C-alpha cells in the first residue's frame, strides 16, 4: 500500500505543480495549495485513469487533504481486490 501512497502523491503533485515532498498530507489542498474544482476534477480523472477509480459524489465531498485522497484510493483498491 505504500506504493499507492507514492503514486497518488506523485499524481497530485504533478497536477497541482508542486514538489511531492512539499505537500503536507494533512493540509487542506483547497486552501493551502489552491486546488479549485477544475484541478479537483483533474485529480479524480487521473485516479480513474490509473486505478479505474470512480469516486461517488458522497466521497468527493469528504476530500479535503492528500491523506483523504490516499485513503479513498486504498479503500477502493481493497474492495476491488476483495
Model-inferred region functions:
Residues 2-35, 39-44, 49-82:
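Phosphopantetheine-dependent thiolation modules in NRPS/PKS and related acyl-activating systems
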Amino acid at each position: 500500500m505504500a506504493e499507492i501512497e507514492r503514486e497518488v502523491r506523485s499524481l497530485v503533485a504533478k497536477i497541482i505543480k508542486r514538489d511531492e515532498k512539499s505537500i503536507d498530507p494533512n493540509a487542506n489542498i483547497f486552501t493551502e495549495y489552491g486546488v479549485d474544482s477544475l484541478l479537483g476534477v483533474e485529480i479524480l480523472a487521473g485516479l480513474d485513469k490509473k486505478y479505474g477509480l470512480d469516486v461517488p459524489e458522497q466521497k468527493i465531498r469528504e476530500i479535503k487533504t492528500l491523506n483523504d485522497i490516499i485513503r479513498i484510493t486504498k479503500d477502493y483498491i481493497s474492495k476491488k481486490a476483495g
